[in-house]
Amino acid sequence: MLSRRTLDCCLVMLIVSTTFCQELHFYKEKADRSHENLKTAVNQFGIHLCRRLLNEGKNIIFSPFSLSTALSMAFVGARGNTAIEMRSGLGFREAGLAQEDVPDSFYQAFQLLKSDQSGDKFYVANTALVQNNYNILNSYKRILHRKFYSDIQPVDFVRNGLWVKEMVNKWVSNITHNKITSLIDKPLSPLTRLFLLNAVYFKGSWKTQFDRKRTTLSLFYNNNKVARRVEMMSLTNKFPYTYDSELKCQVLELPYDGDKTSMIFILPEWDVRLKHVENALSAQSVKQLINNLQDTEIVVTIPKFKLENSPQIKEYLQVMGMNEAFSFSADFSGMNGRRNLFVKDVLHKAMIDVNEEGSEAAAVSGVVVMLKSASHNLPTFVANHPFMFLIINKESGMILFLGSVREL
């Protein structure tokens, strides 16, 4: 027969075990919810930005994930109205993701996106270049290192700008397997204090590959009107497919080997402008389209294509409500404890190559964080070219000496 003491111990252990399991379940639910919210935010941010980029009327390729990652590395250091604007512009407010939950959400995303030995290859890398001897808060560095897996590397933007440029481009080339060989073509400003970088690389083989022998020159109708001969790939197989009567478009999924990643094609009817579909899309509608896909025997014909793009991101982010981050009113005191930093520019490059074997894509994003001025908004006076001078008596107001220097 169990003693009272033994029963008490068993009861305590049961309570502790139950509480521990409840806590684990709570944290798992919270983690799942945070990841779902991050997915919604990144996708919605990408769709909002895509609409604006498409106004240029050109082919586009960019990485919502890469841009969102680099900008979020800055966002976690934002405070006040700067943080409010960035949270809204990056889609976090709409997705219900608080600023303090963003680092953990990205941490979980990086875990899920890790490549294994089978299927497609996806690599993501972050790095933060910091001006030598510039004081960055340990709390900010911890978030970058532990949650964003970011290296933190001291560099000298002031005296070694050319070397920094070459080092950045070499890093970009290495991560993207030479698909993108440069991000910056000249040294960054000597006032740069942080350069937050993200690079992503993807390579996947189609689960069902196209036969090169079936690739032929066929007409592709630009803007549904002007015809041009391009290489078109064809195959017949079962693929996830649907037709959406509201958007009046066909939706096709081509999976990559390993079934972890796939390419989704959205093809409007001939009499429907692509812009109509683009304007109607949202993170929720994309999710719904994917949920409606059903395995269907179908004849697929798509073009081989390569795209490269370096969109001017900054102006579109401002249109999307992120104004203060780029102004002298910016508050990034979560980075260094002071309000003397602002985002000077956001750089982005992306490419994709689609052929019979599969697809290869890469993107790189950079957020340039600068001092608002060299000396806390004081004007600078550098007499390094011809000037005049005079010596004046302040009491009498008379000029005692007057001259000019033209050569030294």
UniProtKB/Swiss-Prot annotation:
Gene Ontology biological-process entries: negative regulation of serine-type endopeptidase activity
Compartments where located: Secreted
Signal peptide: 1-22
Coiled-coil segments: none
SUPFAM superfamilies xrefs: Serpins
Tissues where the protein occurs: Specifically expressed in hemocytes (at protein level).
Annotated S-S bridges: 50-249
Key words, A-Z: Disulfide bond, Glycoprotein, Protease inhibitor, Secreted, Serine protease inhibitor, Signal
One Gene Ontology term of the molecular function aspect: serine-type endopeptidase inhibitor activity
Sites where a glycan is attached: 174
Cellular component per GO, a single term: secretory granule
Site (Reactive bond): 372-373
Function (record text): Serine protease inhibitor that inhibits proclotting enzyme and to a lesser extent clotting factor C and clotting factor G.
Subunit structure of this chain's protein: Monomer. Forms a covalent heterodimer with clotting factor C chain B. Forms a covalent heterodimer with proclotting enzyme heavy chain.
Protein family: Belongs to the serpin family.
Name of the molecule in the record: Intracellular coagulation inhibitor 2
